[in-house]
Amino acid sequence: MRPPPKSWPPTKGSEPLPNAPRIAPPVSAAPPAGKLHGARALSGPLPWLLPALIMLGLFYLYPIAEALRLAFTDARLFDQTTEPSLDSIRRVSQSAALPVILQNTLVYTVASVLGQLGLGMAIAILVVRAERARLRGTMALRTLVLAAWVIPAIANGVIWQLLFSEAPFGAINSALRMVGFAPVAWLSDPSNAMLSAVIATIWQGTAYSMILLYAALKSIDPALNEAAAIDNATGFERFWFITLPHLRAALLVNAILILIMTLNMFDTILSLTGGGPGRATEVLSLFAYNTVFQSFELGRGAVLSILLLIISLTLTAAMVVFLPRERK
C-alpha cells in the first residue's frame, strides 16, 4: 500500500481534486463544566485549608455550640437525662455571688495584664540595651525569665503558696522577720489574697510579654535613638517619642493575648488560694470550674462559660479597634 502524498487531499495545481476525500482536523474534547470546576477547586487553596478548618470546627466551634445547647438545659454532670429549661440562665443571673465574682475578675485581670506588660517591657528593654552594650549575663537573664513561663500553672500556685505561707518556714515572711518587719497574712487576709494571686500570675506571665516586646524592640533602627541622643534628647524623651510609638502594635497584640489568657486562667488561683478566703479571689473562670466539677451543675457551668466568652470577645474587639492600620 502506497503512503498518501505529502499534500492531502491531492491537489492539481492550487485546486484540490473534485473527487478527493476530505479528512477533518482532529477535535480535542473539552472536559465537562462540572469536572473543570472541581479541578479548579482542587488546585486552589481549599485542600490546604481543609485540615485546619476541620480541626477548628472540631475543637473550637463544636464545643461552643455544645455549650450553647447545654446553657438552655438543666443538665447535670453525672445525669444522662436533660430537659430544655431556662432555669440555668435564671439562676446565674440571680446569683448573689455573681457581682462579687465579676468585680474580682476585673481587678485580677486588669492588675495582671498591666503588671505583665510593664514588667515584660522593662526586662525586654534591659536585655536589648545590655546586648548592645555587650554586657555579660544577658543570656542568663533571659533564661531565668523564661524558666517561670515553662512551669505549669498548678505548680506555680503551689510554689507561691509555699513562699507566701504564714507558717515559720514561709520564705517571704521569714525574710520580713530578718529585716525587722512583722509577718504579713498573705493568703488568709482577704485584702492581701488578691494581691498574692496577682503577683503569682505576673511572675509566670511576664516571660510571654518579654518575648514579644523583645522581638519588637530588636526591629527598631538604632540610628533613631542615636540621632535623638545627638539632638540632646533625654532617655525618657527617646522612650516616649521613639520606642513607644514603634511598640504600639506589639503592645496591643500582647495585651489582647494575655488578656484572653488571664480571663481564662483559674489553675494558679485554684492551687494558691482555692478562691478564698471566702470568695476574695474567686474569678469567673474558677466559678465556672467549681460549678461544674464541685456542684455538678453542667447547665449553669455552660452559662458561665458563654458569659466568659462574651466578655473575652467584647474586650478583644474593643482593643482591636486601636491597632494601627496600614495607610494606602
Residue ranges, per PLM feature:
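A structural signal for multi-pass alpha-helical bundles of membrane permease subunits
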Residues: G44-K328
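Transmembrane alpha-helical segments of polytopic membrane transport and secretion proteins
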Residues: M1-L49, R132-M139, V320-K328
